[in-house]
């Protein structure tokens, strides 16, 4: 069996963390620093680097989910793994199939996270939750307006109602929204 078939893409890479790093320390570390620079940073320990990279990986995954959807990304990776069993596909093949299927430039997104140093900043307004009733069904609909004044994209994650992705897989209950740089977006979501 090839290495790709052993990878569980739904949970990200396995990371063994030693010393804990707080979220604020992670944000402080990445402010003004690229992934490229992190790989050669002599001041960060191996376990800490793994945790820092895990946070970057999670952000990349959320960015892709915001663009193509959680279920679609899951199904793509599952199909890619199944169609390449006992093979060693290179990254270019994964990239080509991803770009063809979703019409999204995967390399551009990964390069941004590898080279980028700026962190987004967000302003949130008009945050509210409304009770919506229709045909004896009640839903909590959350909404807000989010402004990103920076030049880099931001990903906003909301906890929403879970859903079936097929094959006995349940969605994470999280929905990711991409807020491009210098833009504002109104988000409305079923919170369950």
Each language-model region and where it sits:
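Acidic/His/Gly-enriched intrinsically disordered linker/tail segments
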Residues: 1-63, 67, 84-85
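Short, flexible coil/linker elements and helix-boundary hinge sites characteristic
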Residues: 6, 99, 103, 181-182
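Amphipathic alpha-helical substructures
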Residues: 42-124
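Generic recognition of flexible, low-complexity loop/linker segments
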Residues: 48-49, 96, 127-133, 143-148
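Short, charged/polar low-complexity linear motifs in solvent-exposed/disordered segments
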Residues: 91-93, 125-129, 171-174
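Extracellular ectodomain segments of secreted/surface proteins
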Residues: 117-139
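Beta-strand-rich binding/interaction modules
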Residues: 133-192
